[in-house]
Amino acid sequence: MRVEETEVFKKYFKNLTDRERAVFEGGITLGALFHQFVGTPVSKYNKESLERAIEEAMKNQPCVYDIKVKIRNVGEKYVSLDGKMLDVDLKIKINKTVAHLKLEYIPEIDYPLMYVKKFEE
């Protein structure tokens, strides 16, 4: 049983709507991903395995329904992963609500932005 399926866990979130809870869990997951993996050595030779490792690690976070990680702008020589390179699509499911969240670099503001794309209910 996953931790989010236990009654003890659920009682701490009774004051939130399913949408609020999905955004909360998604923000924690994207923040954890960013701060855990930025700085990791990456090159074109290990890019795909690092993408899968990040996905599998983040699936351990509560309520993660699906996650896709792409690492952009990687050459032959290794570099340290930074926020400009991350392109992440995350789905968080709370009951019948699915929040679609995104982490991507936005050149116009020179910032790796985390945001909610949409909800399905």
UniProtKB/Swiss-Prot annotation:
List UniProt keywords, sorted A-Z.
Lyase
In the record, biological process GO terms are:
tetrahydromethanopterin biosynthetic process
Q: Which residues bind substrate?
A: 25, 114
EC number annotated for this UniProt entry: 4.1.2.25
Quote the catalytic activity from the record. Answer: 7,8-dihydroneopterin = 6-hydroxymethyl-7,8-dihydropterin + glycolaldehyde
Q: Which domain of life is it from?
A: Archaea
**Enzyme kind, highest EC tier:** lyase
Taken from the record, one Pfam family name reads: DHNA
Q: How does activity depend on pH?
A: Optimum pH is 8.3.
Q: Note the Gene3D superfamilies from the entry.
A: 7,8-dihydroneopterin aldolase (MptD)
Molecular functions per Gene Ontology: dihydroneopterin aldolase activity
The pathway where this protein functions is: Cofactor biosynthesis; 5,6,7,8-tetrahydromethanopterin biosynthesis
Describe its partners and assembly state.
Homotetramer.
What does this protein's UniProt record list under function? Catalyzes the conversion of 7,8-dihydroneopterin (H2Neo) to 6-hydroxymethyl-7,8-dihydropterin (6-HMD).
Q: What family is this protein classified in?
A: Belongs to the archaeal dihydroneopterin aldolase family.
Q: Name it.
A: Dihydroneopterin aldolase
Q: What is the lineage of its organism?
A: Archaea, Methanobacteriati, Methanobacteriota, Methanomada group, Methanococci
